[in-house]
Amino acid sequence: MSRVLVMGGSSGIGLETVKALLGRGHDVIAFSRGAKNLRLDHPKLDRISGDATNTEEVRNAITDADAVVQALGVPVSLKLLTGPIDLFSSATKTLIPIMEEMDIKRLIAVTGFGAGNSNEAINCVQRIPFNVIFGHAYRDKSAQETLIKGSTLNWTIVRPGVLTNQSLKRSYKVRLKPSEWRNGIISRAAVADYIAAAIDDDTTIGEEPVLTT
């Protein structure tokens, strides 16, 4: 089993991924600003509080890891609409050189449907509201994807659709081909289930699936 660092591991997809990885027997490091307040106890769980854009804090957290899950998020706020947002690209600029230096190859990064080349699959009805609400964040997520693809890491980019807090149903769809890409709902638990299964699955390296129900 791997020892996995989950960045953004105290909430949202990150927290669900921590739970899913623990359920599969992995050792997990939950890394986030609020990690010390994480209300989850498990003998294979370590918590490290830190800033994903701080080089020394990331280096300290990643030291014993075999793989990294990047599941960062920004809160819904006025800044999401007005921007600018650079968390995703800044954290990735911090992370990649450290992983390459320490020869930690496996990275799974969560972005979203509409980031990178999946933006072309947004239909005309959704495009205007998507750009108004999520434009700043997703431009930065697209920059994040570009950085990851330009690295030497064994990466998988995960692009969930509209997120819900519903319980896990393993009937979700993993849309690998651009011709299959479309928006749809997906639970955070389902995204985490995919990540936990993919972490040691070399067949997912270089893939960028869109996940929906």
Task: Put a short name on every predicted segment.
Residues 4-24:
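N-terminal Rossmann NAD(P)H-binding glycine-rich loop of SDR-like oxidoreductase domains
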Residues 29, 90, 94-136, 150:
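Conserved Rossmann-fold NAD(P)-dependent oxidoreductase catalytic core, especially the SDR/UDP-sugar
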Residues 158, 186-196, 207:
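Substrate-positioning beta->alpha
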